[in-house]
Amino acid sequence: MANVANKYAKALFDVAIDKDRLDLMYDELSEVSEATKNYGEDLRAIDSNPNQPASERRKFVGIVFGDANYYLKNMLMILANNRHLVLINSIFKEFKSLYNEYHNEDSAIVESVYQLSDEELDRIKDLILKQTNLSQVHITTKINPELIGGFRVKVGTTVLDGSVKKDLEQIERKFRRVN
């Protein structure tokens, strides 16, 4: 289903670029995703109910998402027709990835043993920007006591590991090679 979500996201992204409404589309799709994120099972039930015709699913979309811009509402109607309403959050995730790539931005998860100060986060942000050549990075922090000390950064598929745990694991591997 991720491939299906990617196709919807790419189509919506292309329309948003073509109509010069990328930021508006991002904001509205973000709101729709946020509003539906806790209703996945309900959307799945709507999609899978064989007794609910497409006209009722479209009516539901019109009532719930009536204020959405024309292009977003059109995509939501297509989702209703194709019984893919459950994909809304996956579509936003894919759209966000395209949006970030377009703006040379990405999200990063910074793990540390303790809550990092703003100054530490700024230094880590600068490091991430230098290592990745991104123009902007959005940081989410996570406390991970298993690191023992230092920090670990995940940006997409890249991991920058400056943790004490990693250092200890490297020392352990060296000792094993010697023995």
Swiss-Prot record:
<comment type="function">
    <text>This protein is part of the stalk that links CF(0) to CF(1). It either transmits conformational changes from CF(0) to CF(1) or is implicated in proton conduction.</text>
</comment>
<keyword id="KW-0066">ATP synthesis</keyword>
<dbReference type="GO" id="GO:0046933">
    <property type="term" value="F:proton-transporting ATP synthase activity, rotational mechanism"/>
</dbReference>
<dbReference type="GO" id="GO:0045259">
    <property type="term" value="C:proton-transporting ATP synthase complex"/>
</dbReference>
<dbReference type="GO" id="GO:0005886">
    <property type="term" value="C:plasma membrane"/>
</dbReference>
<keyword id="KW-1003">Cell membrane</keyword>
<comment type="function">
    <text>F(1)F(0) ATP synthase produces ATP from ADP in the presence of a proton or sodium gradient. F-type ATPases consist of two structural domains, F(1) containing the extramembraneous catalytic core and F(0) containing the membrane proton channel, linked together by a central stalk and a peripheral stalk. During catalysis, ATP synthesis in the catalytic domain of F(1) is coupled via a rotary mechanism of the central stalk subunits to proton translocation.</text>
</comment>
<keyword id="KW-0139">CF(1)</keyword>
<protein>
    <recommendedName>
        <fullName>ATP synthase subunit delta</fullName>
    </recommendedName>
</protein>
<keyword id="KW-0813">Transport</keyword>
<comment type="similarity">
    <text>Belongs to the ATPase delta chain family.</text>
</comment>
<comment type="subunit">
    <text>F-type ATPases have 2 components, F(1) - the catalytic core - and F(0) - the membrane proton channel. F(1) has five subunits: alpha(3), beta(3), gamma(1), delta(1), epsilon(1). F(0) has three main subunits: a(1), b(2) and c(10-14). The alpha and beta chains form an alternating ring which encloses part of the gamma chain. F(1) is attached to F(0) by a central stalk formed by the gamma and epsilon chains, while a peripheral stalk is formed by the delta and b chains.</text>
</comment>
<dbReference type="InterPro" id="IPR026015">
    <property type="entry name" value="ATP_synth_OSCP/delta_N_sf"/>
</dbReference>
<dbReference type="InterPro" id="IPR000711">
    <property type="entry name" value="ATPase_OSCP/dsu"/>
</dbReference>
<keyword id="KW-0406">Ion transport</keyword>
<dbReference type="InterPro" id="IPR020781">
    <property type="entry name" value="ATPase_OSCP/d_CS"/>
</dbReference>
<keyword id="KW-0472">Membrane</keyword>
<keyword id="KW-0375">Hydrogen ion transport</keyword>
<dbReference type="Pfam" id="PF00213">
    <property type="entry name" value="OSCP"/>
</dbReference>
